[in-house]
Each structure stands twice: as structure tokens, then as C-alpha cells.
From Swiss-Prot:
Cell compartment(s), UniProt: Cytoplasm
Annotated residues for binding of ATP: G125, T126, H127, G128, K129, T130, T131
Pathway stated in the Swiss-Prot or TrEMBL entry: Cell wall biogenesis; peptidoglycan biosynthesis
Cited function: Cell wall formation.
GO annotations of cellular component type: cytoplasm
Protein name: UDP-N-acetylmuramate--L-alanine ligase
Biological source species: Stutzerimonas stutzeri (strain A1501)
Major enzyme class: ligase
InterPro entries in UniProt: Mur-like_cat_sf, Mur_ligase_C, Mur_ligase_C_dom_sf, Mur_ligase_cen, Mur_ligase_N, MurCDEF_pg_biosynth, UDP-N-AcMur_Ala_ligase_MurC
GO biological process, one term: peptidoglycan biosynthetic process
Homology family: Belongs to the MurCDEF family.
Main location: cytoplasm
Reactions that this protein is recorded to catalyse: UDP-N-acetyl-alpha-D-muramate + L-alanine + ATP = UDP-N-acetyl-alpha-D-muramoyl-L-alanine + ADP + phosphate + H(+)
EC number(s) per entry: 6.3.2.8
Length: 485
């Protein structure tokens, strides 16, 4: 029988001497979820950010004190500061806290504290963390386990990226971008894949990145469980170094949890799961692409190990309503002779872009793909330049927005004009450069044909363009949003 929230609060040990917790950069996707859980546990929460957002408004409605702008006075009365890796010691709030000997802890350390007295499930990997974590939350809820979760994206069904549950389970993303996942000590850890990204954290040394993942897995107790995607060659390579119980998953014949008979029909993907000692299980997910089959397999592996029955697994996967900005279908835009399907996606690494393109080709093979892409960070564009040129050239029509800098200075030869030139040189596609987001609607409308899929993709401010297109007078304003079949 599930416990009441009050009972959970009584069971979970409180942090001694901590009454008010202050978040610097509270609106960030990795910060607001932890803040919400702490609010629900009864702590006083305050935080600052450079601007208001849906996240800060939500936290404020729950009782958090929100400051717009970073000022030393915001810290008054705080017992601890929580900071993301984007915040440095020059920040006036951090500087005052250090001067007054108020503890300043990384976001991941606070997440680790929440996980300390729970059965923690941490999802790591370069790609697929948010979707896998969200699927786990859905399946555990369907199994009656009511988990606490902290996710890097908004669950469509829950309308939030975090929730305090009544069970002992805490499901969270484990962030390798700044190596902060080493703070976590979960009972179960997933590694979806290991790819070259955020390499500045690792001094440009891919070997160091691999070793850090091994170190993360060794944070598991000797009786814990590492759930590993054996289809990923780098994950397969590190398995012999992991001195912990393991379960593998993938399409490979030697995977412990394996998918066969995959079939995609538009947004829904069907497949059969093979597990040692279990009957074959037919499941479906309302998400396109083999990459989402892999995310579901990781979920199934953990749910099976935790004793969730097959009926709940099937239900939790089938009813999963998706995550914000992960192949999120906004509706249809009217064009001459019909309409186009408008999709928004967060993918910002060549491997993620390739997976989404493959999903589109698999679910809608007869449709053209019109892609609007915004590279994220000049350093990533430079480091993966040739891969971007290759994969972006696979669309039918391509519009490239300028690189979203994410605080970086421009790097010569790593901007979108240069990308356009390099893709054009291949002779298969003539990309269009989009200097500003407001220019997109008039540029893209003449290019669209009835039946096209219009995909806006990237991790920067392109995330606001899909809803803007729906409201654009060029596409009929708000009347353009019609439910997609």
C-alpha cells in the first residue's frame, strides 16, 4: 500500500541544520526539478535567475521565493546554495556565500543527497537519458510504485519534470556533461551509449570519458545493477571493466533483453521483447524510431528486475505520452493543397539528428523532410563539423539558423554560414541560411508542400519557434493547430 506524502516526509531523513535552500539559476531544467522536490519535502526554497520562465512561475506558485537577477542580497537567510556547472565563483551570490562560509554545493550533490536514503535509479549516457528516465517513471507508476523522479524534460502527462512520490524509488538523469554524475550513488544505473560530446570536460580525451563512465558504474554497491546497451560499441568495450552485476539490452543477439520484429506505423512503434526466463512480450510505444525502442528496452530490463508485472510494463509503455521537445508533434500547418506536420525536437548531436531522420523515414517514408536546424555551441560544431555536414545533408530541404552560442565566443569556420557552404559543396542540397528566428516563417512557407514534415531541431532558442509558427499569420494563426492523426 502506497504511503502518504506526509509519511514519506517523516521517513526520509532531513538534512540537519538546513532550513532554507537557495538555487542560483533556479529556472534551469536540471535545477527546477530538484527545487520542486525539496519544496514538497517541506524545505524553504528560494532561487534566482536572469529571467522569468514557466519553471520559475511554477515554483513560485508552490511557495518558492524567486529573484530575477543575481544579487548578493538574494542569499540572505540561506543555509546552503545549490549551483549548476554554468555558475562560477564570480557570481555575486556565490561570492557572498563563500565569504560567509555558507555551503555551496553542485546540483548533482544535492540530487545525490535526495537519492541517499532511497532506491536510486540513475540514467546516464550521451543520448536518450531524458526519454529513458521518463519511460521508467511511467512504467513504475503503472506498476503502482509511485516513484519520485527528476527529469531533464517535461513529462507531457504529468506537466512537470519532477515529482515527489510515495515509494522508496527515486529515478533521475545522471549528467556526464560536467562529470557531476560521479556524485551519485544509485542502486541501479543505466548507460544508454557513450559518444564524443562535452569533450572540454574531459580535456578532449575520449579515453578519459570512458574511464569516467566506468567510475560512475563503480559507484553502484556490489549488489547493485548496471543496465547497459550492448549495441553501443563503446559500452560493449567497457563491460569487462565493470565489477558489478550487469544486464545488457539491445538488438544484438547476445543481449539479455532484446527487441525483435520491430514495426513502425507513424508515431507508434511495435516490437517483441525477449528476456531470459520470460515469455516473449509484445509492446508498443507512442514514439518513432529504433532509438526509442532501445530506451524502452532499458526500461523493461529494470522493471523486470524490480518485479513489475508484464501487464503494467505494457500499459506504462503504451500510455506514455512523451516528453517535451522529444519529437513533439505540435499539429498541422496549412499550406496550398493540404497541410504539413510540425515537429519539434531537442536533438543537437549528429547521432541524435541521424536517429530522428531515420525515424521520420521509417514512419512516413513517402513524405519529404523539411528541416530547420540550429547548431548548439560553436565548440560542438567545430569538433563534429564533418559529421554535421554529412547528417544534415540527408534532409530533403534544409534551413540553418545561426549557432546558439550557450555562452561561447564565435569560432572561425564553425558557424552556420560555413556549414551551409560545406553542405552545398556536396552537391545534393542547397541549404538556406536563417539569420533570425523572426525570418523563418516567410522563408520556409514557399518551400513547403502538402504532406511534408517540418522539423525544428536543436537545443537552443529554436525550441520556441514551433509554437511561434503555429501563431504566425502566414499559417493562419492559432487556427493552424489541428490534432495530428
Amino acid at each position: 500500500m502506497a504511503k502518504s506524502p506526509a509519511a514519506v516526509k517523516a521517513e526520509v531523513r532531513r538534512m540537519r541544520r538546513i532550513r532554507r535552500i537557495h538555487f542560483v539559476g533556479i529556472g534551469g531544467v536540471g535545477m527546477c526539478g530538484i527545487a520542486e522536490v525539496l519544496l514538497n519535502l517541506g524545505y524553504e526554497v528560494s532561487g534566482s535567475d536572469l529571467k522569468e520562465s514557466a519553471s520559475t512561475e511554477r515554483l513560485q506558485s508552490f511557495g518558492a521565493q524567486i529573484f530575477i537577477g543575481h544579487q548578493a542580497g538574494n542569499v540572505a537567510g540561506a543555509d546552503v546554495l545549490v549551483v549548476s556547472s554554468a555558475i562560477n565563483s564570480a557570481n555575486p551570490e556565490v561570492a557572498l556565500a563563500l565569504e560567509q562560509r555558507i555551503p555551496v554545493v553542485p546540483r548533482a550533490e544535492m540530487l545525490a543527497e535526495l537519492m541517499r536514503y532511497r532506491h536510486g535509479i540513475a540514467v546516464a549516457g550521451t543520448h536518450g537519458k531524458t526519454t529513458t528516465t521518463s519511460l521508467l517513471a511511467s512504467v513504475f507508476a503503472a506498476g503502482g510504485l509511485d516513484p519520485t523522479f527528476v527529469i531533464g524534460g517535461r513529462l507531457t502527462a504529468a506537466g512537470t519534470n519532477a515529482q515527489l512520490g510515495s515509494s522508496r524509488y527515486l529515478i533521475a538523469e545522471a549528467d556526464e556533461s560536467d562529470a557531476s554524475f560521479l556524485h551519485l550513488q544509485p542502486m541501479v544505473a543505466v548507460v544508454t551509449n557513450i559518444d564524443a560530446d562535452h569533450m572540454s570536460t574531459y580535456g578532449g580525451d575520449f579515453g578519459k570519458l570512458k574511464k569516467t563512465f566506468v567510475e560512475f558504474l563503480h559507484n553502484l554497491p556490489f549488489y547493485g545493477l548496471a543496465v547497459l546497451c550492448v549495441d553501443d560499441p563503446v559500452v560493449r568495450e567497457i563491460i569487462p571493466q565493470i565489477g558489478r552485476p550487469t544486464t545488457t539490452y539491445g538488438f544484438s543477439e547476445d543481449a539479455d533483453v532484446r527487441a525483435i520484429n520491430v514495426r513502425q506505423e507513424g508515431m507508434r512503434t511495435y516490437f517483441t521483447v525477449l528476456r531470459d526466463g520470460c515469455e516473449p512480450l509484445d509492446v508498443s510505444v507512442h514514439m518513432p524510431g529504433n532509438h526509442n525502442v532501445l530506451n524502452a528496452l532499458a526500461t523493461i530490463a529494470i522493471a523486470t528486475d524490480e518485479g513489475i508485472d508484464d501487464e503494467a510494463i505494457v500499459q506504462g509503455l503504451a500510455e506514455f505520452a512523451g516528453v517535451g521537445r522529444r519529437f513533439q508533434v505540435y499539429g498541422n500547418l496549412p499550406v496550398d493543397g493540404g497541410s504539413v506536420m510540425l515537429v519539434d525536437d531537442y536533438g543537437h548531436h549528429p547521432r541524435e539528428v541521424a536517429a530522428v531522420i531515420k525515424a521520420v523515414r521509417g514512419g512516413w517514408p513517402e513524405r519529404r523532410l523539411v528541416m530547420v536546424y540550429q547548431p548548439h555551441r560553436y565548440s560542438r560544431t567545430r569538433d563534429l563539423y564533418d559529421d554535421f555536414v554529412q547528417v544534415l545533408g540527408e534532409s530533403n530541404v534544409l534551413l540553418l539558423m545561426e549557432v546558439y552560442p550557450a555562452g561561447e565566443e564565435p569560432i572561425p569556420g564553425a558557424d552556420s554560414r560555413q556549414l551551409c557552404h560545406s553542405i552545398r559543396q556536396r552537391g545534393q542540397l542547397d541549404p538556406i541560411y536563417v539569420e533570425r528566428g523572426v525570418d523563418l516563417a516567410p522563408l520556409v512557407k514557399p518551400l513547403l508542400r502538402a504532406g511534408d514534415i517540418l522539423l525544428c531541431q536543436g537545443a537552443g532558442d529554436i525550441g520556441g519557434l514551433a509554437p511561434q509558427l503555429l501563431k504566425s499569420p502566414l499559417f493562419g494563426g492559432d487556427d493552424a493547430a489541428r490534432k495530428t492523426k
